């Protein structure tokens, strides 16, 4: 119902324009055919053509009608702009009155006034957007000069035939206008919309992309032919001077990287050549404008636009690597790492091999690879040396432990030897020297510690007979009644054994002595004497305290005196 109301409104406008006689109906009929060929659901499609200017090569165009009509009426091109669902601004030769008329035609309030109250919930004005629900950016599409996008088939065709751009320029076909400005905000109702709120947030319709509504069939064919041959980048890499060598790239304007200034859209050299009467058209980029223009200027592989500089620098680096190797070899030789430069060039070690390859690298990727190999080989060599050092330290530790065991056993053996030696020395000291001190320390003669009497001829013991007392000989008298002069002849001293015969040898001590010491005999003499018990105990005690022979002699003299006094 809304579509019929739209068409009836357009027919009434055509009837009013026909009596004027200023324009033929052929342009309007072609325009209506394009309107009827589109579906109402395609109204919210791409409207990038709203911001493009088509210079009609004919004399008076449909835009001249819009100039003569009032601001309250909707002209034929503006109505078609609203119905086609594409943002393509179609006008004649641009001028300030035409821009004002076009801005007035796109006013949203005028569109509602032209439709009247016959629109429903699916009306064209609602499909065109209300200004707040649309996804239009504040800057007009492609104002910063992004690469144009299109159908993938056109992209592949243009990639296969890169010479079509030059053919279009030779045929005088329109060139795309980079960084064009938006619609002027000169209407009262257009300040909020600016002609851009008519693009809703719906998905892009690829079927309506190539449809351009123009007042001239010849211009339509030229624009369609131009759009078909135009390079696109919707599904492939952007065409750059590095990827398309056959096409001469126009130099970029200085406003392409930061956006064009208002009122002065940048243009290329080819646009200056064809800017006379050549129509220009621009298709909206399907990609949202992000970043800056400098991103699309660089190829995808990251290389420079001028590969000649890198090639020259690479060749220069290849020429310099020989001198670098010589300098490195000289440095290693001076540091003492290697013996000579020939060793660095001919060494088969992994570190030296990667070092030579790193110095001979032609680019940074190869150099990075070789440097990584050098680091890993050096790390592996260091780890191997660390393992060798660990094994060596382990062997040294085992050797030290074995040395400790050997030293411990040797110490024990040495202690045993020392103990045996000391026992032998003590035995020898007992053999060769006396334990106590002698009185005559001045004597130079050596006195043995053990004295053995020389062997004597023993007299046969005769049994005592009382008849012997009759003999004059006192030899057989008992000791108790023997005279004192015979006591000096006792050959067995008590404490100090004097050797009256120095001829006695040192081995005589080994001979058993047949005569015992007389200390026990002296005690028996005292106990058998007629003295009292107290005197006997006193003499025995004093005898046990004697230290020398003189003391023993003095004690025995006292004992004898007491006995004599008692007997007498």
Curated annotation (Swiss-Prot):
Question: List-wise, which residues carry Phosphoserine?
Answer: 68, 125, 192, 249, 257, 260, 447, 449
Disordered as annotated region, ranges: 1-23, 38-320, 496-516
On modification after translation, the UniProt record reads: Phosphorylated by PKC/PRKCZ, and other unknown kinases. Phosphorylation is necessary for viral transcription and replication. The N-terminus contains the majority of phosphorylated sites. Ser-249 is the major site of phosphorylation, but is not necessary for most functions.
Compositional bias (Basic and acidic residues) at which positions?
A: 7-20, 83-101, 150-168
Which keywords does this chain's UniProt record carry? Chaperone, Coiled coil, Phosphoprotein, Viral RNA replication
Which parts of the chain span the membrane according to its record? none
Annotated region L protein binding: the residues are 412-445
Q: State the InterPro entries in the record.
A: Paramyxo_PProtein_C, PProtein_oligomer_dom1, RNA_pol_Pprot-P_XD_paramyxovir
Q: Where is this region: Multimerization?
A: 344-411
Give the family, as the similarity comment puts it. Answer: Belongs to the respirovirus P protein family.
Q: What is this protein's function?
A: Essential cofactor of the RNA polymerase L that plays a central role in the transcription and replication by forming the polymerase complex with RNA polymerase L and recruiting L to the genomic N-RNA template for RNA synthesis. Also plays a central role in the encapsidation of nascent RNA chains by forming the encapsidation complex with the nucleocapsid protein N (N-P complex). Acts as a chaperone for newly synthesized free N protein, so-called N0, allowing encapsidation of nascent RNA chains during replication.
Protein name in the entry:
Phosphoprotein
Q: Provide the gene name from the record.
A: P/V/C
């Amino acid at each position: 119902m809304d579509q019929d109301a739209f068409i009836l409104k357009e027919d009434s406008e055509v009837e009013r324009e026909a009596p004027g006689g200023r324009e033929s109906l052929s342009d309007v009929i072609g325009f209506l055919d394009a309107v009827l060929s589109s579906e109402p659901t395609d109204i919210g499609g791409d409207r990038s053509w709203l911001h493009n200017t088509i210079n009609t090569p004919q004399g008076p165009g449909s835009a001249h009608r819009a100039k003569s009509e009032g601001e309250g009426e909707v002209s034929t091109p503006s109505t078609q702009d609203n119905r086609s669902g594409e943002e393509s601004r179609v006008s004649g030769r641009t001028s300030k009155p035409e821009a004002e008329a076009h801005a007035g035609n796109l006013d949203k309030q005028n569109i509602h006034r032209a439709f009247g109250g016959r629109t429903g919930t699916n009306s064209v004005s609602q499909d065109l957007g209300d200004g707040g629900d649309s996804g239009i950016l504040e800057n007009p599409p492609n104002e910063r000069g992004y690469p144009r996008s299109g159908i993938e088939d056109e992209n592949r065709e243009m990639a296969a035939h890169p010479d079509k751009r030059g053919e279009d320029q030779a045929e005088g076909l329109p060139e795309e206008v980079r960084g064009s400005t938006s619609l002027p905000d000169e209407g009262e109702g257009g300040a909020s919309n600016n002609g851009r709120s008519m693009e809703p947030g719906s998905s892009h319709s690829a079927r309506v992309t190539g449809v351009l509504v123009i007042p001239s069939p010849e211009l339509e064919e030229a624009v369609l032919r131009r759009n078909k041959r135009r390079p696109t980048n919707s599904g492939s890499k952007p065409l750059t001077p590095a990827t398309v060598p056959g096409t001469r790239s126009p130099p970029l304007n200085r406003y392409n990287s930061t956006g064009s200034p208002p009122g002065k859209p940048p243009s290329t050299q080819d646009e200056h050549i064809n800017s006379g009467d050549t129509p220009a058209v621009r298709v909206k980029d399907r990609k949202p404008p992000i970043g800056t223009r400098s991103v699309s200027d660089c190829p995808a592989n990251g290389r420079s636009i001028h590969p000649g500089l890198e090639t020259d620098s690479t060749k220069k680096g290849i020429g310099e690597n020989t001198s670098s190797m010589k300098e490195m070899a000289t440095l290693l030789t001076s540091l003492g790492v290697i013996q000579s430069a020939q060793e660095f060039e001919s060494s088969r070690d992994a570190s030296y091999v990667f070092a030579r390859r790193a110095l001979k690298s032609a680019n940074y990727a190869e150099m990075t690879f070789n440097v990584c190999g050098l680091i890993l080989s050096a790390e592996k060599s260091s780890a191997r040396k660390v393992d060798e050092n660990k094994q060596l330290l382990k062997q040294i530790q085992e050797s030290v432990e074995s040395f400790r065991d050997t030293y411990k056993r040797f110490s024990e053996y040495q202690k045993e030897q020392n103990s045996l030696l000391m026992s032998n020395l003590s035995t020898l000291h007992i053999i060769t020297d006396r334990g106590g001190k002698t009185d005559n320390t001045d004597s130079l003669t050596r006195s043995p510690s053990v004295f053995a009497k020389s062997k004597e001829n023993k007299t046969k013991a005769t049994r005592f007979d009382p008849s012997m007392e009759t003999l004059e000989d006192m030899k057989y008298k008992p000791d108790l009644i023997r005279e004192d002069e015979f006591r000096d002849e006792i050959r067995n001293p008590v404490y100090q054994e004097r050797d009256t015969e120095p001829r006695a040898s040192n081995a005589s001590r080994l001979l058993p002595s047949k005569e015992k010491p007389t200390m026990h005999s002296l005690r028996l003499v005292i106990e058998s004497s007629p003295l009292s018990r107290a005197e006997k105990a006193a003499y025995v005690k004093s005898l046990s305290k004697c230290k020398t022979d003189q003391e023993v002699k003095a004690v025995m003299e006292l004992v004898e005196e007491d006995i004599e006094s008692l007997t007498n």
